[in-house]
Amino acid sequence: MDEKLTTYDPAEDLVSDEAMAVFVEEAFRTEDAGYVAHALGIVARAKGMTQIANETGLSREQLYRSFSANGNPTLKTTIAVMKALGIELTAEPHIREDSVA
């Protein structure tokens, strides 16, 4: 019996704004800039790349290139895309384990 494998696209499962926000939050927790960019690209595809392009003023090609696995978007582009996605970038103090009394 031959097994047929299909490519999994996580964008297909990101159907709610909450799921998209959690997906991006988890990507940021990895502290891997390339993975964060890729995750934002996945969420942008889930939301609709044309819609994101229209809201940011960036071309679809620029978005695909910037938020690919090898992309390196500028902070300006990242903030614009996150705003278009309805995801807020926030900062919290980092609590180091060795500083806990």
PLM segments and residue spans:
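Long, contiguous binding/interaction regions
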Residues: 57, 80, 94-101
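Short basic helix-loop element that most often maps to the first helix and adjoining turn
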Residues: 36-55
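DNA major-groove recognition helix of helix-turn-helix/homeodomain DNA-binding modules
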Residues: 75-92
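Recognition helix of helix-turn-helix/homeodomain-like DNA-binding domains
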Residues: 57-73
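N-terminal flexible/basic segments that precede or flank functional cores
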Residues: 1-42, 98-101
